[in-house]
Amino acid sequence: MPDAFTIRPAAPNDAQEVARIRVLGWRFAYQGLVPQGYLDSLSIAEDTERMCGYLSQLSQDAPPKSSAFGLNSGDSGKRSFMLAVRDDAVLGFCHFSAAPNNTDRVERATPGGTMNGRLHSLYIDPDALGQGIGHALMSHALSTFAAWGCERAHLWVLEGNSRAVSFYERQGWQLTGDTKVDRSFGVCLVEHEMTIQF
């Protein structure tokens, strides 16, 4: 049985490991769902540079300067980027936020702006799958959403990613039937929304 792992906030010096897991996670999870040329073009070095900048902003509690990691410029809500770590090795990460009316659909905004959460990403090193790391990171995110006063949270999952849908459903998330097309990564990807209530 593998040794225990801990969950802690990400810091700028974790950027390379986070980028490595993100790239490996994309190549593992999205093979056959995303054009192979795009997956092959993913660069740990380029992602490290972007991630270092984002984690630096996050550590200073500054609003994000771009939406490259799922938040809009000027977002004044709460953000968290947590790592699962064993013996200083990063095994996975979970990035989530909460804000009043934190929704991708303007028509869902409510008067008074109820606090809503959003799970932006959850990736595990493919070599560390099946060790409870994803469940632990998700449990941390859900308890944080509740502590922040969120009434609900949502995420988007790539069409055809049945492994992710099954994982999220086991954690209590449900498909809403809503879809969107994401072009932010240079390819057209259809995503399905999932939500959870608190």
PLM regions and their residue ranges:
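Active-site acidic-Proline motif in GNAT/NAT acetyltransferases
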Residues: 125-127, 131, 159-160
